Amino acid sequence: MPGRLVAAGVGAVVIASVALVVALFAAGSRPRDLGGVGGPDLFISWLLPLLKLMSTLATVGCAGALLAAVVLLRIEGGPLGVQGRRAVRDASNSAIIWAVCAFANAVVTAAILLDTPVGLLRMRFDDALGVPEVKALLITGILVLALAIGIRRVQTSSAAGLGVLVAIAALIPTAVTAYPRNESYVVLAGAALVLHVIAATTWVGGLAGLVRYGRASRTGLPIVLERYGQVAYISSIAVLLSGLISAAGRLAAKGGGWGSILDPLTGDAYGALLIVKIAAFLLLIVLSALHRSRAHGDLVDGGQPFWRIVGVELFVMALALGLSIALSQTI
């Protein structure tokens, strides 16, 4: 694996992790030891956002590899090429990590919501299964585990496309349970969040696929980049619009109605993080479009334009991912 590819991956993980921790402290949402007896300790509380981040990164890796096989590296006629088969195997490996994180997240979530040490959850098994968030994580884990097994030896783009549909289905349960109340603005926010998660995963996963497989063929790189540009353009619009709708619904829920949206936006930690995240995504949309348009014509002449394109997008995307996890932890 090229050194710059490793550096890009490690850098993205570090940036996302730092953004998550800094945002949690800045918003006052960092896990705390409440000093109670019999509940989960501080370590378990910190595991929740960290597992969410690991799960998100694994999701991006799985989605990116599948998108690469189905869209970026598409070969006319159906069968996957060498890089396409490699991408499918990578997607299977990422799906295994995603499934493990989902199951571990279910255990940690149950421990926190039921205020029970992990070691004693077996005594409250039925209670844990009754928690919507836990059920959603278990459903996700089962779907993703089936995905990992099913796509392991896929040989055609159509079969890999079915894997994409399963991956999308696995994103829905946890997104749906993020807004359990029934007010109109909460229902709207929940529906928009589902679209937001799918679009964001497609966009970020597409970039991951571009970084991982885009330079496998120097002569094919402009074509791969053009395909990624189309995916990124559609996904970025969907991410922005669905994110704004979801955020508006969440702010209405926090403020008590549509007329009180500005109160939590200007005077709440969630509102501050939301503004930073929106700014990061707007910056990402503008910069990525500018870099792709300027560097596209020079790709065949050298490697620097390619890494200039993905470097900027990776940095801002990793920052936005960390902020997204922090937002999900901010009440």
Predicted regions located by residue number:
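Polytopic transmembrane helical bundles with strong interfacial aromatic enrichment
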Residues: 1-331
